[in-house]
Every structure is written in structure tokens, then in C-alpha cells.
Amino acid sequence: YLWLATLCSNGFGGILADDMGLGKTLQVIVFLYAHYIVQGENNRNTLIVCPASLVYNWAQECQHFAPELPICTVAGTAAERRELLDSLPDHPGQILITSYDLLRRDIEQYQNLTFDYQIIDEAQFIKNATTKAAQAVKQINSRFRLALTGTPVENRLGELWSIFDYLMPGYLFSYSRFREELELPIIQQQDEDALHRIQKMIAPFILRRLKKDVLKDLPEKLEKNMYAKMTGEQQELYQAHVQRLQMLLSKQSPEEFDHSRIQILSELTKLRQLCCDPALLYEKYTSGSAKLDLCLELIHNAMESGHKMLVFSQFTTMLDRIAERLQKEHIPYFMLTGATTKQERIRLVTEFNQDETPVFLISLKAGGTGLNLTAADIVIHFDPWWNTAVQNQATDRVHRIGQTNRVLVYKLIAQNSIEENIVKLQEQKAELAEQILGGDNIGTPFFSREELLELLQ
């Protein structure tokens, strides 16, 4: 709280980058409670912007911890939202909660409004400075700006620049100057002076505490890679796709490679789907999936020991396949995807934390952030994602304040496949965030045609 109050009183913005599960939402609620209730600033306006899936979660958390706060969700039809925003000048002292998407749509209504406090949650949503979401949050007139994210840097330094461009425009220069003086020297030349310079510039405005330093009594988290060996038709289909992609890459010139990145990404996605279950690509495929069998084995073993678990996948079609197996084996489960409504999300989370349902199937994109599911103590990542920070965020739906059991994390990996190389790539990308936020050595998060060929080895 003192850090937030100091920044606010001195006219600076900041990034609250605490490790996932350390209560960033609650810290903001305490900050607002101190200003609105304790200090009686009942004419101040606040805007909280978050992913659409978290709007009602924010409102619920505020109601739970500080019911006195004047919370108002900006939702409903365009006409209803316009009426609410138009009335704000005559009724100050509101804490508005809206989504990035609705802010973008309603940006004209916000042009004549001024906010004392502007908070963006899951600030990685604005890591690309050219997106409409990033442009929208930067257009708001606000006195104090705060960004919440457990991952200020996921892939490249330009993401950090975009967040600071929202917090304090110009502090990290224009992007072209930032890229020339800091980003390129660090990434391409391993320039230690540039690294120390950016660390020194951002340090006062980033508060990052790790669970191991703050929560001494948080139960341990054990991670284990579980390997599944593809056999028979699954292995044959996978190898055929690998050979086709290797041939495509080896024949391309650098210019052709640059112009076919979307096609290559599509082919890589197909390889990842084949590792999961060839039925995701071939409707008539019936020969089974090594990873699906392994996943069901883990689920059965966990249930026999009385555990509840989350199963994450990037592919909702894979979750459907797992659900089919669970139904056949009469195992109760919940499922949450991008198609799940906000109200239904809250209901599913509440019921899972209270009842005996052992399995919660969750798409990584839809449920990897903003959920509290400490009733579970086992996490299964069915397929690895390019960036380990995304999977860590998902794991921390379980490994967070309120967890009383040791947490087991199983990462399912198809043996001798692209998935093994994705895991290696995850480790490299994790280096970038560690360097900027206090680490030592410099690595590169990018890959060339040659590195893509290595992924296929």
C-alpha cells in the first residue's frame, strides 16, 4: 500500500508485478478503500479495465472485501452503457469496471471524462502497442495509472515499453529510440550496459514479489514432466507431417520464409494437435492417443487418493475429447471455455470449490487467469504452450493464497516430438523476463528458419 500511495502522491505510475496468486486484486481494493472510505474522497472517479471474463470477478471481490466501495460495472447494451457514462459528471465518486473490448467500443463516451485512478488488470493485454485495446487505455484522461500483471515481459522488450507508454508516456522514450538504444543492443548484442540502464530506469516503478519470498507457509509446488510415447498410426501421421514441413522450410529462401510465417505457424499447430490426438485433425481417426491414455490414468490415480484437479489445454476440441472419455468412464467434471458466459464461470468456480466434482477441464486462454480454484491440488497441462509464463499463470489458479495442500503439476509431453523442443524454448523465453526484472544473463526469445528446423528434430 505504501508503494502505491507514494507513486500516486508523487504523480508517477507503476506496475504491480507480484507473482501470480499473491493478491494483486486485493491490494488494489485496499488502496481504493483507503482513499474512498478512510480518507473520504467520495467525489473521486476510478476506472478499472480488465479482460471481459474478469469483470464480474472484480465486482465480486470488491463486494466481498469492501462492500462500502461504490462499484459499478459498465455492461449491458450500448445504449445502457452510454447512459451510465453520460451520467458520471453529475454523479462523481464512482468506481467503474469495464472490459478492454467494451472500453474500445465506448471510447468516444470516455473522451470527456476524467478519472483520478485508472487501473488495468492483466496488463499483458496491451503488450502490443498497436492494438486498439492498448490505444484505448492510453486515451483515457487519468491522474494516477496502475498496471497489474504477473508477466510484464513475456516475449520481447517492446511489451514492457507499451505498458510504460500507458503509465508514463515518454518515460522510456519513443519506441523507435527505445528499440535502437535498449531493445536491440540487449537482444542482438548482449549489451550489459543497456541491460543495467533499463533495469535502473524501471526499478522504482515496478513492485515484484515472489511467492517464495512472501508466503513462507505456502505449500510446496512439485512439477513433473510426464512423457507419452506415440506409437502406430499416431506416430506415422506425426512423422509424415514433420517431413512435409522440413521439406517446405529447407527449400525456402529467406524472403519466402518471411512471407510464409502464417502458413508455418499453421503447420506447427497441426503438429501439436497430432501430439495431443490425431482425431483433432482427422475425423475418421480411431487408433487412440498416447497422451489421452496417460491423462486418464493420472485422473484415475488422483481420484483414488481423493484429489481434485484442473486439466488445461489450448485446444477446446481436445477438452471435448477428454470430456468424452470422462463420460464413458462415468467421471463427473466441469468444463470452462471461451464460450462460457461470465455468470456461468462464477457458478462453475463456486460449485467446484464446494462440491465433490473431481475434474475441471479448462481452456488455457479462457481460464488461465483470474480464477481461484484452491479446492484442487493437482494441475495437468495436457499440452505445452510456447511461453511458460502462460502455463504458470494457469497453475497459480491452484497454487495461491488459500491453498493448504501440496500442489502437484503434471506436464504431459509427447516423447521425441516438437513438444520436447517447445519445453526447451520455454526455458529460453523465461530468461528474458528474469534478465529485465533482476536477472543476469541475456538470451533471445526469437527464432529463425534454422531454429524452426531445430524444433522439428
Mark where each language-model region is.
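ASCE P-loop NTPase motor core, strongest for the SF2 helicase catalytic module
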Residues: 1-191, 197-457
